[in-house]
Amino acid sequence: MRRVALAVLFALTATPAFAIDANAPEQCITGPIEKTYGGTPWLVASCSDGKSLVFVAKEGGKAAPFEFDLTFTGNDYDLTGHGKGDRKFTDAAYADLQKLTGKDVLDLLNATKAAKPKN
């Protein structure tokens, strides 16, 4: 597990979109928005803590099935992943996600908040 140090300010609301890991302490259902990491499409949702994000490989993508959790720990972030997607593509996405800045995270949080719910 690697730590991704980011300093950000956050505020969002929740709207249902898609199911996320039931073991996660937060609900991560705001959004989603679609982004590309590691050359593959990902659905990004923000969590009820207003600071954490979940990246789910889009169904049919080469990284699927896989999920990354960017979890706010109080002072910084933990980036963890799990699933059975193609390792080449999940590793490439992981490398891209490690490069996210505080501004990038804030932009993603704001974009998920602004996303229209997918019914």
PLM regions: where:
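Short, linear, compositionally biased motifs with a strong N-terminal bias
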Residues: F10-A11
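N-terminal secretory signal peptides
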Residues: A19-E67
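Acidic, aromatic-enriched beta-alpha/helix-loop junctions
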Residues: K58-Y94
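N-terminal signal peptide c-region/cleavage motif recognized by signal peptidases
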Residues: A14-P16
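C-terminal partner/receptor-binding element of secreted or periplasmic proteins
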Residues: G83-N119
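Sec-dependent signal peptide recognition
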Residues: R2-A7
